[in-house]
Every structure is written in structure tokens, then in C-alpha cells.
Amino acid sequence: MRDHPQTMRATQVIGLSLLVLTAAVAAQVPVNDEPHHRTVYQNADFRILDVRVAPGESTLDHRHDHDIFTVSMNAGTATRIVANGQAQNRPGRPLADATITEYTGKPGSHKLDNVGAAPYMLFAVENLRDQKAWSAAPPVSALATTLATDGRALRVYDIRLATPTSQTTHTHAVPTVAVLINGIVMSEGPDAQAKALAPAPVGLKRLDSPGQWVLVPRGETHTVVRLGNMDARLLEVEVR
């Protein structure tokens, strides 16, 4: 029996579409394999990424599979995001601009072009845990601590230490990453899990440069103390 010409053309179109789709998916790389997204630390619960794109540079088309927190670590720069063949220009993200983007169960991909005059710099935390295992523990409440974003997979606190409040204490039910925005602080906590969580900084740690971070293991209490006369600010990210 001879194939009908229309049937053959339809088959060819479907085959070509699948080929294009397969090629597009293959061209995407996982975000942690994209050269401008450097993995700083990773365990079974979360991954920390240092994102740096110099002026005039572009990332590869990369794929996000997990909910992710990002915070701008400088005054920002203009960028162009290209997703699904559509380009969108975006203004710079100011220092400490923090967002949570949901990708778990609904992955997305894009590439980023730095079209500004300054580096594009982000500190990022991904929740790698299975969605069914996410914690429903309530948020913490403490001095100088504001719940900034209560996301389904990540929760963000804004801690600002200034006169007269020079320190604050938290106990987190889930692993928590504290990242310095400005000022100088000492993070005080037990280091019993330091070996198991190495090379993550755990326990007594001085943070004196923006972007420095410390890991607070689940269930442990830590105190953040401002050092010197400058105000200090950090963000704490609970991996739920």
C-alpha cells in the first residue's frame, strides 16, 4: 500500500519538530554546569551558587530545575534575558535586592546578556530536596529580624543590626545560610557538625566582606553580633 503524500508530509513535519525540540533541550545546560554559575557548596539539601557575568558577556542557555533564592551583591547592571526565543531588557537589581523563583515541578530555561557597564553579581541558594519533604515549620521571630519572603521552598529573613540592637539570636528548624550584605558581624554557634558539613563554614565565624556566608545546621542556635561601629546587614535563607 502506498503512503498518501499528505500523510508523508505530516510525518516529516512531526519528525522535524521533534528534532528541533530535542536539539533545543540538548543545547540547554543545567544551571550548575553553566560557567558563570559557580557552585560554591552543595549537599543533599541545597546548593550555593556564585553568579558573575562581566559586562559584555553572556551566559549559556541554561535550565533551572529547583526553586532558587537570589540576591544582588552590587548596585546592579542592565541585562537582557532571552527565554523561549523572546528577549526582555531588565534594569539593574540594586544591592540586596532578593527574589525567590519557583522552578521545582515547572523547570525553565533562559540565557542572560550583561548589556550594562558593571558586573552582574548574585549570591544564590537552590533547594534540592524533594518537594514532598519540604518543611512546614513556622518562621522564627527575633530582635532585628524581619521575615522578608516566605516562599514554599525557601524562606528569607532580613537582619539589620544597628544601635541599640547589636545582636540577635535564632534557632532554625531547617538548614539556614546566612550571607553578609554589609558591615562586620560574628556568627556564634556550635561546630559539632563542622566536619560532616565541610567545607561549609560552620560555628564561630567572622563575616567582614559582602558575600561571605555561614551555614547554620538544622535545629541549632546561633547568635549574630555586630562588630565595630558600622551598621550591619545580612540575609538568612532557610532551606525548607
Locations of regions flagged by a protein language model:
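Short N-terminal segments immediately surrounding and downstream of signal-peptide cleavage
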Residues: 28-48
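Bacterial N-terminal signal peptides
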Residues: 11-24
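Glycine- and acidic-residue-biased ligand/ion/polar-headgroup-sensing regions
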Residues: 65-84, 173-194
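Surface-exposed beta-loop interaction hotspot
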Residues: 109-162
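A short beta-loop-beta micro-motif enriched in histidine and acidic residues
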Residues: 56-69, 164-177, 199-201, 208
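Short beta-strand His + acidic residue motifs that chelate non-heme Fe in jelly-roll/DSBH
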Residues: 59-61, 79-80, 109-115, 167-170, ...
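Ligand-binding loop in jelly-roll beta-barrel domains
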Residues: 105-128, 217-240
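Short acidic-glycine-tyrosine-enriched beta hairpin
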Residues: 84-105, 193-219
